[in-house]
Amino acid sequence: MQRPIVYVGMSADLIHPGHINILSRAAELGDITIGLLTDAAIASYKRLPHMTYEQRKAVVENLKGVASVVPQRTLDYAENLRTVRPDFVVHGDDWQTGVQRHTRERVIEVLSEWGGKLVEIPYTPGISSTRLHSSVKEVGTTPNVRLSRLRRLLDSKDIVRILEVHNGLTGLIIENSKVTVDNQAREFDGMWSSSLTDSLARGKPDTEAVDVSSRLQMVNELFEVTTKPLVFDGDTGGKPEHFGFTVRSLERLGVSAVIVEDKEGLKRNSLFGTDVPQTQSSVEDFSERIRIGKRAQITDDFMVIARIESLILEKGMADAVHRAEAYVDAGADGIMIHSRQSDPAEIFEFCRYFDKLPRRVPLVVVPTSYSSVRESELADAGVNMVIYANHLMRAVYPQVTKVVQSILQHGRAHEAESMLASIKDALSIIPENAG
């Protein structure tokens, strides 16, 4: 006699006694089919899992009582349930409230089509995946794990969200900041090491005046207190014969990607556009720079992303699209298209042309000038990564200036207190301060 089919949906990133309890109870009902959530399914409502889908599958299919494992590509069980048509779905009772309650209602609705039943197991007290993930985060990460995370994010999310960082404190803020929007957790996926804000933090001009070694020291300090992936602003990449060494150094630290722009000569900030002299590299010279970077890297995970300045320098859309195709052919792992217009119209136009190219790589934008555009609009246009490139430094400057002026004006600090964090809050930024 054939045993009943029991469907259990799982992320299975960190297996704990609560999972084993559910599987043991499910095995009493019949043969277990695991609907293993893909990386994309998990990333749609919380952080990317530590282990890849294939790694998690290798663990789950060897658990006692598991008869088969199938990928579950969305948080919604409906498609898999209609394919498998299980007699039972088994789940912990912790999904009766919160972000998954609508998923639960949908499961009950679909099961009713053939008389299947939902069996809910009481939550195992004292342990949860969330707590375990927090503990893992406290331990930290390794260079290889951090480095590979960006490619996994690009493969798993509609759009990857990156924010500028210029010291360990801003790194901690990005690491720990999270909001809930429409019952889903939202956080930044990674960090951007900006040459502009690195320079400003040192009181120097944004002309590549801060050498790569000095910037790498900041990256090293940042990596001591964070776990998220980092994208490095490589400016022009320096001399072509030096770029390969830069790539090796970044990769060794665990940086996930370098973005290098197709300009040459004295570096000036792109947002000046044609108001200052700026020279764009030839397609041939910059393509060779990309090839130098790709030849230098050791792993397959590190990304060399080509930044196109054609729209900034008013060279036209055709030139930008031509360069994109040439840079992809040269081996670029991604394309960043830059614009200083106040609306995203030319970015959207570029996206339409870019999607028609023979080879497609991730597309990156930096909406500094056209800040009114929403991430959802960019994702719909085909953008894969959005970088908020200078916002934490720009947030610091006006507030610090106000505090300085207030103390000077009043001859005391009392009037500035409303603009300051309390001593208690300032100390709590670093938990170890509490002893």
Swiss-Prot record:
CDD domains: cytidylyltransferase, ICL_PEPM. Residues 1-139 are annotated as: Cytidylyltransferase. Its EC number is 2.7.7.104, 5.4.2.9. Disruption phenotype: Deletion mutant does not produce fosfomycin. The active site is at D206 (nucleophile). InterPro entries: Archaeal_FAD_synthase, Cyt_trans-like, ICL/PEPM, PEnolPyrv_PMutase_core, Pyrv/PenolPyrv_kinase-like_dom, Pyrv_kinase-like_dom_sf, Rossmann-like_a/b/a_fold. The keyword Nucleotidyltransferase applies. Cytidine 5'-{[hydroxy(2-hydroxyethyl)phosphonoyl]phosphate} binds at S11, A12, Y45, K46, Y77, H91, G92, D93, D94, Q100, T124, P125, G126, I127. The CyTase reaction requires a divalent metal ion. Highest activity is observed with Co(2+), but it can also use Mg2(+), Ni2(+), Fe2(+) or Mn2(+). Bifunctional enzyme that catalyzes two steps during fosfomycin biosynthesis. It catalyzes the conversion of phosphoenolpyruvate (PEP) to phosphonopyruvate (PnPy), the first step of the pathway. It also catalyzes the cytidylylation of the 2-hydroxyethylphosphonate (HEP) intermediate to produce cytidylyl-2-hydroxyethylphosphonate (HEP-CMP), the fourth step of the pathway. In the N-terminal section; belongs to the cytidylyltransferase family. In the C-terminal section; belongs to the isocitrate lyase/PEP mutase superfamily. PEP mutase family. Contains an N-terminal cytidylyltransferase (CyTase) domain and a C-terminal phosphoenolpyruvate phosphomutase domain. This is Fosfomycin biosynthesis bifunctional protein Fom1. It comes from Streptomyces wedmorensis.
